């Protein structure tokens, strides 16, 4: 029987690796032929995905909050969805701002024995909000 916490664990690691800028650590949770698509971008391999993550260096910080999850295992393959709110802190015209995104990740995870990795993780952006920050 497959541990039902696996999708949550992978999603939390993904958020941590992004927020801590540990982009190469994605290799721990993604297959080499990992793919991702979203509005205005795509990656056809894990190397391309990691290269795409460099755009996040334009932000002074990010904060990805992992929320609801729903999905099912069928043999060694999981297909499901992860809800997330991603905050991106940046400066514009001398003002600190926060771009928030409501995201629904479309997750596909495979298992080989005791190793679980993403095959794909597509993004559906439900909403965005860009406001000045208050500290």
Language model segments and positions:
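Short, low-complexity N-terminal intrinsically disordered segments enriched in polar/charged residues
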Residues: 1-24, 28-32, 47
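A structural preference for long, well-packed, hydrophobic secondary-structure segments
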Residues: 13-14, 84-85, 102
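A solvent-exposed, acidic/Ser-Thr-rich amphipathic alpha-helical stretch
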Residues: 23-86
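Short aromatic-glycine motifs in intrinsically disordered, low-complexity regions
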Residues: 58, 96-98, 110
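Short beta-strand edge/turn micro-motifs at domain boundaries
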Residues: 79, 102-135
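Short, cysteine-centered beta-strand-loop-beta hairpins and adjacent loop/turn segments enriched
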Residues: 87-97, 128-129
């Amino acid at each position: 029987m497959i541990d039902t916490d696996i999708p949550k664990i992978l999603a939390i690691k993904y958020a941590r690796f992004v927020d801590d800028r540990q982009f190469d650590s994605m290799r721990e949770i993604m297959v080499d032929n990992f793919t991702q698509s979203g509005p205005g971008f795509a990656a056809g391999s894990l190397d391309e995905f990691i290269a795409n993550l460099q755009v996040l260096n334009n932000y002074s910080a990010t904060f990805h909050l992992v929320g609801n999850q729903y999905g099912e295992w069928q043999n060694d393959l999981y297909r499901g969805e992860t809800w997330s709110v991603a905050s991106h802190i940046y400066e514009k015209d001398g003002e600190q701002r926060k771009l928030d995104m409501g995201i629904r990740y479309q997750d596909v995870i495979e298992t080989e024995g005791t190793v679980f990795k993403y095959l794909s993780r597509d993004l559906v952006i439900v909403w965005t909000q860009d406001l000045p920050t208050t500290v």
